[in-house]
């Protein structure tokens, strides 16, 4: 950052040296094993990445607030829309990045392939609910922080509570649901049409 602000939708120095870029309001930081730095630039409605070469680039978000669902889910994160104030971010063990997308009332994940999806929260701003069910159907109002464990489960700071999403739920995509096997050792994942998609280990979440 060069000490001056910028406006949503402007490049703000992306593609150039980070020291000369404009930074608006950083609410979260995460450092990758390769030394890259990710920052949640809330007022710019995007997540940005500073590589080892010192170049800053947009990583997720166009800078424009989401007005039409699904806000870019299922496509390139750089073309997605984030909330007015994305806050906490965290890196997962598989090099994915999790974003507490506060005003959209959800947790979003950018995979190593650059595709963004919602992994927790149905977007509603109501009293928290949905514990014990799929994370994507739960009500998670205004999450502020997220932390990811080694097994792929993640924790959400949410309105006076910390909520946990297990590795099985963390493996679900939007619209999917699961059923446990009779002995509880496996979980069967189905899409919204009821078609079986994959089988997961109930303990680890691995396929």
Regions found by a protein language model. Give the residues of each.
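Residue-level detector of Asp-centered blade-edge/turn motifs that repeat once per structural unit
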Residues: 31-34, 91-94, 148-151
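Conserved beta-propeller blade signature
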Residues: 36-38, 96-99, 153-156
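Short loop/turn segments immediately following the C-termini of beta-strands
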Residues: 42, 102, 159
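Blade-level signature of beta-propeller repeat domains, shared across WD40, Kelch, NHL, RCC1
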Residues: 142-168
């Amino acid at each position: 950052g060069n000490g001056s602000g910028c406006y949503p939708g402007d490049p703000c120095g992306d593609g150039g040296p980070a020291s000369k870029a404009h930074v608006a309001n950083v609410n979260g930081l995460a450092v990758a094993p390769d030394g890259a730095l990710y920052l949640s630039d809330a007022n710019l409605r995007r997540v940005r990445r500073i590589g080892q070469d010192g170049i800053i680039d947009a990583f997720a978000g166009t800078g424009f607030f989401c007005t039409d669902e699904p806000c870019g889910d299922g496509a390139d994160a750089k073309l997605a829309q984030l909330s007015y104030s994305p806050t906490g971010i965290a890196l997962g063990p598989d090099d994915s990045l999790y974003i507490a997308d506060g005003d959209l009332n959800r947790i979003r994940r950018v995979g190593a392939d650059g595709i963004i999806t919602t992994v927790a929260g149905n977007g509603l701003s109501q009293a928290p609910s949905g514990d014990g069910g799929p994370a994507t159907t739960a009500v998670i109002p205004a999450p502020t922080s997220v932390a990811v464990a080694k097994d792929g489960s993640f924790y959400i700071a949410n309105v006076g509570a910390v909520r946990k999403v297990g590795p099985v739920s963390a493996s679900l995509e939007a619209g999917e649901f699961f059923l446990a096997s009779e002995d509880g050792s496996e979980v069967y994942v189905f899409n919204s049409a009821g078609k079986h998609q994959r089988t997961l280990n109930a303990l680890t979440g691995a396929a």
